[in-house]
């Protein structure tokens, strides 16, 4: 289905405020949002939201959210051709080395070094090829935590391509439940699990949050990895505490540097303690224990 990009421009501070409001307003809709700097010298930023249907309704909701912010340009629209933009932009990217892992496409199969664990992930509609700072940060943290703590039952919440679930399974040879709210991502995850010969350990399921019978059957987990976004991570903190065994480890990412303290505070309030933070560009990956 073709997409419509709705966008506007302003100086940095109003743009960031607008982006935060839109992120909160459209959180339940799952619409992609983006903010980028167009002109550093003049401090001009552009905020975009992408809609596959009813873009007029989206535009009305945007205006309602943003009426009190001064200095924003009019909302403009741009029709985008029907292209798998993820595959289009990621095709041909070089392999990523993160921790013990060598994440690659089929064109670099067999090029891993001695001691590296190869994971083959093709560009697709599911997030997670290892190139993003959140994914590489999680892979690095998994490489540190798993050999030291020897978990026996793991969860990858918001699995996307299943690269993190596959990494845990290939490194530790333990059962991993990999879930995602998006059925397309779950289908891609299942294909990647088979491709990487991890089906013996990884179970996939389409589930919003912790709402699936598999959780009751598989809990408690002694390792949970969640690479989503800061706001939903904070909201999930009580459920994380219920599903993680005492002494278990939590690896969180999808968190911008300025959101780190807020996320940590949300989990400390649920009885977690912060151990380590990894920084990858503007993103952080956090290791906590219960």
Swiss-Prot record:
Compartmental location: Cytoplasm
Gene3D superfamilies the UniProt entry points to: Vaccinia Virus protein VP39
Enzyme Commission numbers on file: 2.1.1.-
Residues where S-adenosyl-L-methionine binds: 135, 158, 180, 227
Top-level division of the source organism's lineage: Bacteria
A Pfam family of this chain: PrmA
GO BP of this protein: methylation
GO cellular component: cytoplasm
GO molecular function annotations of the record: protein-lysine N-methyltransferase activity
Keywords: Cytoplasm, Methyltransferase, S-adenosyl-L-methionine, Transferase
UniProt signal peptide: none
Reaction catalysis annotation: L-lysyl-[protein] + 3 S-adenosyl-L-methionine = N(6),N(6),N(6)-trimethyl-L-lysyl-[protein] + 3 S-adenosyl-L-homocysteine + 3 H(+)
PANTHER family given in the database record: ELECTRON TRANSFER FLAVOPROTEIN BETA SUBUNIT LYSINE METHYLTRANSFERASE
Protein task: Methylates ribosomal protein L11.
Family: Belongs to the methyltransferase superfamily. PrmA family.
UniProt protein name: Ribosomal protein L11 methyltransferase
Organism: Chelativorans sp. (strain BNC1)
Gene encoding the protein: prmA
